[in-house]
A protein has these predicted regions:
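Phosphate-backbone binding interfaces of nucleic-acid-interacting proteins
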Residues: 1-119
Length: 119
């Protein structure tokens, strides 16, 4: 485990419950050449309660835009929007580093409806 991956200080269950992590389906994906680090712009459908949200994800080593449309992803939907260059990212799409340090997306391993909350 690298120093960047070291465990963070303990959090309470109440802290965890403040983070709203939902399942969504990528409906659009496009290159994001204006980003400082290689990234892909995502448009994600989180169902009728949350709706469509945008995200920038640094996932170009493992994915191309055409492979992402239709893919289920997990994202934090209640962080404030963040300006990434000329793009406003509305959710934080979740991923983990593989053995080569490349980010791979966190996805449900079987069907989950759009908008489903992580428990």
């Amino acid at each position: 485990m690298s120093k960047d991956e070291a465990a963070t200080p303990p959090a309470s269950f109440d802290d965890f419950m403040k983070i709203d992590i939902r399942c969504g389906t990528v409906v659009e994906a496009a290159p994001f050449p204006e980003a400082r680090k290689p990234a892909i712009k995502l448009v994600i459908d989180f169902g009728p309660e949350i709706g469509i949200r945008k995200s920038s994800a640094q996932i170009t080593e493992q994915y191309s835009p055409d492979t992402l449309v239709g893919k289920k992803v997990m994202a934090v939907v209640n962080f404030p929007p963040r300006q990434i260059g000329p793009f406003m990212s509305e959710v934080l799409t979740l991923g983990v580093a593989n053995e080569r340090g490349e980010v791979v997306l966190v996805t449900p391993d079987s069907y989950a409806p759009d908008g489903s909350r992580l428990h």
